[in-house]
């Protein structure tokens, strides 16, 4: 396609009547406007957009027509103004956010997109290891697998990660208890539950949960004796 003055407006390829392969467009002043790829009419892969003055405007990737991964937006003077992460079209977070903002975002995402919430929590744990929100995030991941997804083996894995990564935290005690509880009351693996409860008593002899753990062990021993 061309503008009335003969300047190129669009350069595209089609397959079966749909945009396919590389695509480029220009402003009327001759500056590049956008460049990327289509696959059977859908934006796919890396795309770049420019302001009319030639400065970068937006840069990122599409997956099946949805913004995906890291996207960077620029002001007309060329300065970066926002770096964001997307997951299949859903905005996850701004890369400039700290752990508190990210944790709040993960809590909100939990209500509508659990997998995306877990991605944000992973980012907190990996990027802000010394923050209290890293501990909270790892524990919340375990809670999501336990209560929302009902994936009990994954919940055990995530609770154990709390114990390993944040051994002195209050959440570590709660996590070791939950590992024991899942084995005993959900998966009915009483032998492993007994082992985990004993591990709890060894690691946390002064915990507020000691009485509850001793009671659980007593009940486990009783059930195992009757079997």
Enumerate the predicted regions with their spans.
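Glycine/tyrosine- and acidic-biased, solvent-exposed loop/turn segments at the edges of beta-strands
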Residues: 1-132, 146, 160
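Short solvent-exposed coil/turn linkers within tandem alpha-helical repeat scaffolds
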Residues: 17, 41, 65, 125-134, ...
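Terminal, low-structured helical/coil segments at or just beyond the last alpha-helical repeat
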Residues: 99, 108, 188, 194-227
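TPR-repeat structural position
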Residues: 114-115, 152, 190
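Specific register positions within alpha-helical solenoid repeats of the TPR/Sel1-like families, i.e.
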Residues: 110-111, 143-146, 180-184, 222
């Amino acid at each position: 396609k061309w503008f009335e003055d003969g300047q190129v407006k669009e350069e595209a390829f089609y397959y079966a009547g749909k945009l396919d392969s590389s695509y480029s467009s220009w402003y009327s002043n001759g500056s590049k406007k956008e460049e990327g790829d289509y696959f059977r009419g859908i934006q796919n892969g890396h795309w770049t957009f420019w302001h009319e003055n030639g400065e970068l405007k937006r840069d990122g990737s599409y997956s099946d027509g949805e913004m995906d991964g890291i996207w960077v937006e620029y002001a007309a003077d060329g300065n970066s103004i926002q770096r964001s992460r997307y997951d299949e079209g859903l905005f996850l977070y701004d890369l400039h956010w700290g752990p508190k903002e990210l944790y709040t975002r993960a809590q909100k995402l939990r209500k509508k997109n659990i997998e995306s919430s877990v991605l944000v929590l992973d980012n907190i744990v990996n990027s802000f290891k010394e923050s209290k929100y890293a501990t909270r995030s790892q524990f919340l991941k375990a809670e999501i697998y336990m209560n929302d997804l009902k994936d009990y083996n994954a919940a055990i894995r995530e609770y154990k990660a709390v114990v390993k990564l944040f051994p002195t935290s209050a959440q570590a005690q709660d996590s070791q208890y939950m590992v024991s509880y899942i084995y005993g009351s959900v998966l009915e693996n009483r032998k492993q539950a007994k082992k985990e409860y004993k591990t709890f008593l060894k690691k946390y002899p002064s915990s507020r949960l000691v009485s509850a753990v001793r009671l659980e062990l007593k009940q486990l021993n009783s059930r195992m004796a009757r079997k």
